[in-house]
């Protein structure tokens, strides 16, 4: 028995490993793996079902078919273990060796491995520096290649056709060596001296200047170096020995009726063996060359098909006309090994069923049908039955359970007690899609779910199904209880707000309960407390809504957390007093003394969690739910057709609109407006009418007239059921009520354009056939959109998870002083997101100074919680520099301080938290709520009229930034700078509003001026761009020659004449080189200088500019010299919704991006070409100027002589994130991507914390391009992981050597995922073949740092609870201790023994 245990122990040993390396296999290595050569294509004998000897399933090579039994049956049983039978040559051992023993095929002629040949860029081609076409022609026996030129004039690697070869033979005889086929390529590869080649290339690299050549050389150098360093030999890319997969991994299963089901691989192998054997025979017979050649070509094709079918030529098909599944197909794609079996496994101990409501459950419970529980917990029940002595054997226990004896149910109750189960609803879009509950046994067959967790699961009860999983081990149960229990997941990880929020009925119930009503029964009573309130309500003495005075005792907690109680008599209603009874101690009464809608309830729960913590909140949430359901039932709110009150004003409003439309139609027919203008105006009219009807309807619905106690009629908020449902946030919205009782309004055609006749009817009146038909467009598009959206959103999430999966919090503090400056998000006159929301839960990067003093308000490295944020608000701080993931200095992972608060828990984040995955889920999960559509700015959808002035909303003082201006004769300011910003500051120094002021705008008040709310502070003409003079003097025309560079135009209506500058295309020959300009001179005729510079004031005029001045006229500073008409930008489509988010994260360059200034300096224009202008920027310090050619049709925002800063916009358009990174740096690009992504989510009302987007941006910025390698071994122009560059630089700095310099690169998420250090992670994401080919050639090591790699190799992940295990392993490795070998316990040994003994009876195939 002892040696048996020893033997078992040897089999359960797990291999401990630190990394996985992939490399090319040498022929000797393949032979060393092999247990014998497969010589015959036969598989199994169809009569005896025994494998054929030397065939693809041969027992002698691969091992016995039955456990511990040789093929001929001479040796059976365990005692002959390890004997090799003399008759059939089979080793007596377990049959599972047939899963691991490999064979091999000795190929009669070498064949190229198709991956290294055809996977682009072709590795063989790159190594030999030959085009792929040529190599293919050699491999498939169409031409010869010269291997050794000898004394002849033939070059090595030269391609010869058949004729050329024969000519050369005649001419030179055997002076030279030329071959065809894989042997030739193999010989070429063998003869390469990699190191020498490398040296030559490096010298070439230093000498060349051409960019393309450099690129090609660096590619080759990298490949050669990879070969040298990894120890791979180039000739191994040509196979001489082909490994054969173990037979149990390519099974052949007999079906009934004498047919066989087989893996496609067997067919592919059979082909290879057949052709190989035929080739061997032909070579033995010394057959004619042409036949042998053909056979070799066919062998090459057969091997290609086995490795990667369909990569070259047509795929080989099986009997059913489908392409056969080759080895490459086995591992790639959704159905491949990686995604189907390694990353997504099916789980035992699980069941699924329909869900239904469990309104009486507690938050941590779920109802589990008895039938299901019995099945799921079977093994536990068997164990308990045996332990109690109620059953003697497992078999007896099994019988008892099958008979469902009474005692079984009692045992089940015990087993289930406090054993959590996991509930999962597909699709699991974020981590709250799986939560743990304690099961409560119920009758019936449906799982009961607590209503408050529906929001997290996105579940409803219209037939949704959920799956139940049982955590088996103690550790799993512990994790389920401590981390996954629904009571521990009250806050959403995406934004830190409660996700356990009542909805629908509960909200309606609470709203109904806390509403007040004029002159209700019992109004004016004074009550001793909530208890009495409930008593008089139950007794029917007072209505729930009666306004009464109640004595209320509140417990107030001060900052130290001590509580003091205070009692006061408060004006409230009976319902609110009753509700107060369930509110936990420590919250103020004001929190319930208001009509509670959904937002208010959410805020109440949030406050409760922040003040009192987890447990009271959970109890409170449950109580809220029970109360809400009870009072919703009491309210009896129901919807009848009469509740949809149609406003009387509707008919009048529609009539007015129709008259206006008719009027515009007349104008159109008389030619006053164009068709486009007419269409737009009509749509605007109807949109306005719709708004008016809706307003009339809501005004009508939301109030009702009642008689109060004094008999006077007064208005109160309505108790109309539909209004209450919308107002409380329980169901429906104003927009939906508008369709019920207002008018349906404008509809869109399937292409997105708006139909100009609206649906004037509503659902209460009913639609006529035409109206119904129009509305079906929208409905159908909605359904089609939803289907597309779900798929796209899922794919976005997958890409995000893949790029961020290896980001884990690995240390407490990286010590950096960098960070990003946070300011409130202000658009125009309203604060979209206050500073408080943006910095809450962040850590300060430097001290926050109290505004106006030198006092430190908040020290450095402080986690800003609610209290600190209150302090910031009190002192009206409007910008804070906080730590950010993007600027974190940790090498692999991020530090806790740079991340800040764990949003789902409310304290600083723990080490080992997988922040990358959380970020990806938080961004991906709301993806399905985003729209798919691209908005047409047209129709009523969203058309902003061209802005022409700034009107402030609040009073305060103005603050102008990056401003240059001149004061004109009227004493007003004329802006002469490009990106001027105007901010409105209130008396506390906070920014309230922010606007962009264009060039040439006229401002009545300057910097620091006080303004009142509603005042207009700036005006400009949106349709022209002025040229403003900065000095006073007299005008002098330069190069303004009539007929050559300008023409005169006279306006027919006013009779005024003006000069128009001709575009260079319209000028005659002599005028082409002239540059029309206006100079400003003084009375003597000398040039006036621009203030602060030594440049003469002259303004060059671009084409189409209009001048309304004459030569010699006197002008004052700030006057307009010329006007340049702006073509109104056509209706551009703004991409919205999901596609926009995907574009941002993929870092795609927009079609016509904004052109930014590459360096700071003075603008001038050089010589123009036919379609382009030459923009020259000369730096102020006199260094080299920068030139760029810009197409003529791009409108430029700059004039000659203007000073620009690096990164300023030269020509408008959407900015490319790559340009922003290059010119303005990492923080600017972070800000840009964050703001743009948030814009999309904000439109849909989804809140996501900026942190998550920053996490993804950090991953997009992982790589950099080396500019100068210094003393490192990087190549210049190489893309390298930033962490590796930083580590290398630190090492060099310590040694005092030259560090490498680099620029940061921004990669899209797909590219970034494929460019990760880990080849396992990249291969399991996309383009498996390419990734593995690259990794094998380079001999890459995967250090298994990320989560995905560890899941694939079947280890604990280095995050969460697995973090400690990995830290422990690292520590042991550092100290050089031996890894702990898991000891086999007695139970495991007996289980294994039972398995061995049973193996003889039933041979189970998996």
Curated annotation (Swiss-Prot):
Zn(2+) 2 binds at residues 814, 888, 895, 898. InterPro entries: DNA-dir_RpoC_beta_prime, DNA-dir_RpoC_beta_prime_bact, RNA_pol_asu, RNA_pol_N, RNA_pol_Rpb1_1, RNA_pol_Rpb1_3, RNA_pol_Rpb1_3_sf, RNA_pol_Rpb1_4. The RNAP catalytic core consists of 2 alpha, 1 beta, 1 beta' and 1 omega subunit. When a sigma factor is associated with the core the holoenzyme is formed, which can initiate transcription. Belongs to the RNA polymerase beta' chain family. Keywords: DNA-directed RNA polymerase, Magnesium, Metal-binding, Nucleotidyltransferase, Transcription, Transferase, Zinc. It comes from Yersinia enterocolitica serotype O:8 / biotype 1B (strain NCTC 13174 / 8081). Its EC number is 2.7.7.6. It comes from the Bacteria. This is DNA-directed RNA polymerase subunit beta'.
């Amino acid at each position: 028995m002892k040696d048996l245990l020893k033997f078992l122990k040897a089999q359960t040993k797990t291999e401990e490993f630190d990394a996985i390396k992939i490399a090319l296999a040498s022929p000797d290595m393949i032979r060393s793996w092999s247990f014998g050569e497969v010589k015959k294509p036969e598989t199994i004998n169809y009569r005896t079902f025994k494998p054929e000897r030397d065939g693809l399933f041969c027992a002698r090579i691969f091992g016995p078919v039955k456990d511990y039994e040789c093929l001929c049956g001479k040796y059976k049983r365990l005692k002959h273990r390890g004997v090799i039978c003399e008759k059939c040559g089979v080793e007596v051992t377990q049959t599972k060796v047939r899963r691991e023993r490999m064979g091999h095929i000795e190929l009669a002629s070498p064949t190229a491995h198709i991956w290294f040949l055809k996977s682009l860029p072709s590795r063989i081609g790159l190594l030999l520096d030959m085009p792929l076409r040529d190599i293919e022609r050699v491999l498939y026996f169409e031409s010869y290649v010269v291997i050794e030129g000898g004394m002849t004039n033939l070059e090595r690697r030269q391609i010869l056709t058949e004729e050329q070869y024969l000519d050369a033979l005649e001419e030179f005889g055997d002076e030279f060596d030329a071959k065809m086929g894989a042997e030739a390529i193999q010989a070429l590869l063998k003869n390469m001296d990699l190191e020498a080649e490398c040296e030559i290339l490096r010298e070439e690299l230093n000498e060349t200047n051409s960019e393309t050549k450099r690129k090609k050389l660096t590619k080759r150098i990298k490949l050669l170096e990879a070969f040298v360093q990894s120890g791979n030999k180039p000739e191994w890319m040509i196979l001489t020995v082909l490994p054969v997969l173990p037979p149990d991994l390519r099974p052949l299963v007999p079906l009934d009726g004498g047919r066989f089901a087989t893996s496609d691989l067997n067919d592919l192998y059979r082909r290879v063996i057949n052709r190989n054997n035929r080739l061997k025979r032909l070579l033995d017979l010394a057959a004619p060359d042409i036949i042998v050649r053909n056979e070799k070509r066919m062998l090459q094709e057969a091997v290609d098909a086995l490795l990667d079918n369909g990569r070259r030529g047509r795929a080989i098909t099986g009997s059913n006309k489908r392409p056969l599944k080759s080895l490459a197909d086995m591992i790639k794609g959704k159905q491949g090994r990686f995604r189907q079996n390694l990353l997504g496994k099916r789980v035992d101990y699980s069941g699924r069923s329909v869900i239904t409501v469990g309104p009486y459950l507690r938050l941590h419970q779920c109802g589990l049908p008895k039938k299901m529980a019995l099945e799921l917990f079977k093994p536990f029940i068997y164990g308990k039955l045996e332990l109690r002595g109620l059953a003697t054997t497992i078999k007896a226990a099994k019988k008892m359970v099958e008979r469902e004896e009474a005692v079984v149910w009692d045992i089940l109750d015990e087993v289930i007690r406090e054993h959590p189960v996991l509930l999962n609803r597909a699709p699991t879009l974020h981590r709250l899609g799986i939560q743990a509950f304690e099961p409560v046994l119920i009758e019936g067959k449906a799982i009961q779910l607590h209503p408050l967790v529906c929001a997290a699961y996105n579940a409803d009860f219209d037939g949704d199904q959920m799956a139940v999983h049982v955590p088996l081990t103690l550790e799993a149960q512990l994790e389920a209880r401590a981390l996954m229990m629904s009571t521990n997941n009250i806050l959403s990880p995406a934004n830190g707000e409660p996700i356990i929020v009542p909805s629908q009925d509960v909200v309606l119930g609470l709203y109904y309960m806390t509403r007040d009503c004029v002159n209700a029964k019992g109004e004016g009573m004074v009550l001793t407390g909530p208890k009495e309130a409930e008593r008089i309500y139950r007794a029917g003495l007072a209505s729930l809504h009666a306004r009464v005075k109640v004595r209320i005792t509140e417990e107030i907690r001060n900052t130290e957390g001590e509580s003091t109680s205070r009692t006061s008599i408060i004006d409230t209603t009976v319902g609110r007093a009753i509700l107060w009874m369930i509110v936990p101690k420590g919250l103020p009464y004001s929190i319930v003394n208001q009509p509670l809608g959904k937002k208010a309830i959410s805020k109440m729960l949030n406050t409760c969690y922040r003040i009192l913590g987890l447990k009271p909140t959970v109890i409170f949430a449950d109580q809220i739910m029970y109360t809400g359901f009870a009072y919703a039932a009491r309210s009896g709110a129901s919807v009848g057709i009469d509740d949809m009150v149609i406003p009387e004003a509707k008919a009048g409003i529609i009539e007015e609109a129709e008259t206006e439309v008719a009027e515009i139609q007349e104008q159109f027919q008389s030619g006053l407006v164009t068709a486009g203008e007419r269409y737009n105006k009509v749509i605007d009219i109807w949109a306005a009418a719709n708004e008016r009807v809706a307003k009339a309807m809501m005004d009508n619905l939301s109030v009702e007239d009642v008689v109060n106690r004094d008999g006077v009629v007064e208005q109160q908020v309505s108790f109309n059921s539909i209004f209450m449902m919308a107002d409380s946030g329980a169901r429906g919205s104003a927009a939906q009520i508008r369709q019920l009782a207002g008018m349906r309004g404008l509809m869109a055609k399937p292409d997105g354009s708006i139909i100009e006749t609206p649906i004037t009817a509503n659902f209460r009146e009913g639609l006529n056939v035409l109206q119904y038909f129009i509305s079906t467009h929208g409905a159908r598009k909605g359904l089609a959109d939803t289907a597309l959206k779900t798929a796209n959103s899922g794919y976005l999430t997958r890409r995000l998870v893949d790029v961020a999966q290896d980001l884990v919090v690995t240390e407490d503090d990286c010590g950096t002083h960098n960070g990003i400056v946070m300011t409130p998000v202000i658009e125009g006159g309203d604060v979209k997101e206050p500073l408080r929301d943006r910095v809450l839960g962040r850590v300060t990067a430097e001290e926050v100074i109290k505004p106006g003093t030198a006092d430190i308000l908040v020290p450095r490295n402080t986690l800003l919680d609610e209290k600190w944020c209150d302090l910031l608000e009190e002192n009206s701080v409007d910008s804070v520099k906080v730590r950010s993931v993007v600027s974190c200095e940790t090498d692999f992972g991020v530090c806790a301080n740079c991340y800040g608060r764990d949003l789902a828990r409310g304290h600083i984040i723990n080490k080992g938290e997988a922040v990358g995955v959380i970020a990806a889920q938080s961004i991906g999960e709301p993806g399905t709520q985003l729209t798919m559509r691209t908005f047409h700015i047209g129709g009523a959808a969203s058309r902003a009229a061209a802005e022409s002035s700034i009107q402030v909303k609040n009073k305060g003082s103005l603050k102008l930034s990056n401003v240059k201006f001149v004061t004109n004769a009227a004493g007003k300011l004329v802006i002469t700078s490009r990106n001027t910003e105007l901010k409105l500051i209130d008396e506390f120094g906070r920014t309230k509003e922010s606007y962009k002021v264009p060039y040439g705008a006229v401002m009545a008040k300057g910097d620091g001026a006080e303004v009142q709310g509603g005042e207009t502070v700036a005006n400009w003409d949106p349709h022209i761009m002025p040229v403003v003079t900065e000095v006073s003097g007299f005008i002098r025309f330069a190069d303004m020659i009539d007929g050559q560079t300008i023409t005169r135009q006279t306006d027919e209506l006013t009779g005024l004449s003006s000069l128009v500058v001709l575009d260079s295309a319209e000028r005659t020959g002599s005028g082409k080189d002239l540059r029309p300009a206006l100079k400003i001179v003084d009375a003597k005729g000398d040039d006036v200088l621009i203030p602060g510079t030594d440049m003469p004031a002259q303004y060059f005029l671009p084409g189409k500019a209009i001048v309304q001045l004459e030569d010699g006229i006197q002008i004052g500073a700030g006057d307009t010299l010329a006007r340049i008409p702006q073509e109104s930008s056509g209706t551009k489509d703004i991409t919205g919704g999901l596609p926009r988010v995907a574009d941002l994260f993929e870092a795609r360059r927009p079609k016509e991006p904004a052109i930014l200034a590459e360096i700071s300096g003075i603008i001038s224009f050089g010589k123009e070409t036919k379609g382009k202008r030459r923009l020259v920027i000369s730096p102020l310090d006199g260094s080299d100027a920068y030139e760029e050619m810009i197409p003529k049709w791009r409108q430029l925002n700059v004039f000659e002589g203007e000073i620009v800063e690096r990164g300023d916009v030269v020509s408008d358009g959407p900015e490319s994130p790559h340009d922003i990174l290059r010119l303005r740096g990492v923080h600017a690009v972070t800000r840009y991507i964050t703001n743009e992504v948030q814009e999309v989510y904000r439109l849909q009302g989804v809140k996501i914390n900026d942190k998550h987007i920053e996490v993804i941006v950090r991953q997009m910025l992982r790589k950099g391009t080396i500019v100068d390698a210094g003393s490192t071994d990087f190549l210049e122009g190489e893309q390298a992981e930033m962490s590796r560059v930083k580590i290398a630089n630190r090492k060099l700095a310590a040694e005092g050597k030259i560090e490498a310099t680099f620029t940061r690169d921004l990669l899209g998420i797909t590219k970034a995922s494929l460019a990760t250090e880990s080849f396992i992670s990249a291969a399991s994401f996309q383009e498996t073949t390419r990734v593995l080919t690259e990794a094998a050639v380079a001999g890459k090591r995967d250090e298994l740092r990320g989560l995905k790699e560890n899941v694939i190799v079947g280890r604990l992940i280095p995050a969460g609870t697995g973090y400690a295990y990995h830290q422990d392993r690292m520590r042991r490795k550092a100290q050089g201790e031996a890894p702990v070998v898991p000891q086999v316990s007695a139970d495991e040994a007996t289980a294994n023994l039972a398995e061995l003994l049973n193996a003889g009876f039933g041979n189970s195939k998996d």
